[in-house]
């Protein structure tokens, strides 16, 4: 297999130490003069590998010795993207402290979408707190919320909604609620409706979310129950939350309001 031979011959001891978290070996190689930014034919750096392996100590050492924080592979992967693949909050935090770009040069490898897809809630939370565009709509993926719903990552969907993600923004005409209905997730559907999802929205096939579930199923019955108008309390909550835009959770928490009212606004 020529391809695998090329891959192996392109592999350096520096990459090997980084992916496996061998800090002592990494230090020795760097001290002996190895290039911290040595890349493979695919432009994969030791920092990419350290983050992919979730090895924060190795990533920290590489960054201190001049590793490029925004290096891009031929697949458009940045170290930040690699950290979102592994779900390493420690690596993610390090990269952000060293000036990593939240938004990649190409939508083929979006960190927030990757974190949402894999269910890495803490990564989603950290990216959100640093100001990532949580409604970033990638043509072939949709929004982070849509990706979370498509992959049945309830906790990530909740975190995005709490942070002010647009509940109706999905992939083209397909809404997050359509994705939740397709996966027959009662929990996701209830969550989205609670945050004001439009149950009447039609996708490219002119189908509403409820038309994507088997009639008579628990989810089908839930949609029938929710067909009526929202209560005045729900409408007020949605209106107030919209006023705060992104980072709603932090802003509402800081309001001088009774705790019970805060809990209601926060969907606690």
Language model segments and positions:
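Ankyrin repeat start-site detector
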Residues: 8-9, 41-42, 74-76, 106-108, ...
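N-terminal segments that cap or nucleate solenoid repeat domains
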Residues: 1-41
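Conserved ankyrin/ankyrin-like repeat signature
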Residues: 25, 57-58, 90-91, 122-123, ...
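Cullin-RING E3 adaptor/co-adaptor recruitment helices
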Residues: 183, 190, 195-268
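Ankyrin repeat domain, specifically the short helix-to-loop turn at the C-terminus of the second helix
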Residues: 28-34, 60-67, 93-100, 125-133, ...
């Amino acid at each position: 297999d020529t391809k695998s031979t090329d891959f192996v011959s392109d592999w350096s001891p520096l990459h090997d130490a980084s992916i496996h978290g061998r800090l002592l070996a990494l230090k020795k190689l760097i001290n002996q003069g190895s290039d911290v930014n040595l890349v493979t034919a695919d432009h994969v750096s030791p920092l990419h590998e350290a983050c992919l392996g979730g090895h924060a100590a190795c990533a920290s050492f590489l960054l201190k010795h001049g590793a490029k924080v925004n290096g891009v592979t031929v697949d458009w992967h940045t170290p930040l993207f690699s950290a979102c693949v592994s779900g390493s909050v420690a690596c993610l935090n390090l990269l952000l402290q060293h000036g990593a770009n939240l938004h990649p040069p190409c939508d083929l490898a979006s960190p927030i979408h990757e974190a949402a897809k894999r269910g890495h809630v803490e990564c989603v939370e950290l990216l959100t707190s640093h100001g990532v565009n949580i409604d970033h709509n990638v043509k072939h993926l949709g929004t982070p919320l849509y990706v979370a719903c498509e992959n049945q990552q309830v906790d990530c969907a909740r975190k995005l909604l709490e942070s002010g993600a647009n509940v109706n923004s999905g992939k083209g005409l397909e809404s997050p609620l359509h994705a939740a209905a397709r996966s027959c997730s009662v929990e996701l559907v209830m969550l989205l409706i609670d945050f004001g999802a439009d149950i009447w929205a039609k996708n490219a096939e002119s189908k509403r979310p409820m038309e994507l579930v088997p009639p008579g199923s628990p989810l089908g019955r839930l949609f029938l129950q929710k067909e009526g108008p929202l209560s005045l309390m729900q409408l007020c909550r949605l209106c107030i939350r919209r006023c705060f835009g992104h980072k709603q959770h932090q802003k509402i928490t800081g309001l001088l309001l009774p705790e019970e009212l805060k809990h209601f606004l926060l969907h606690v």
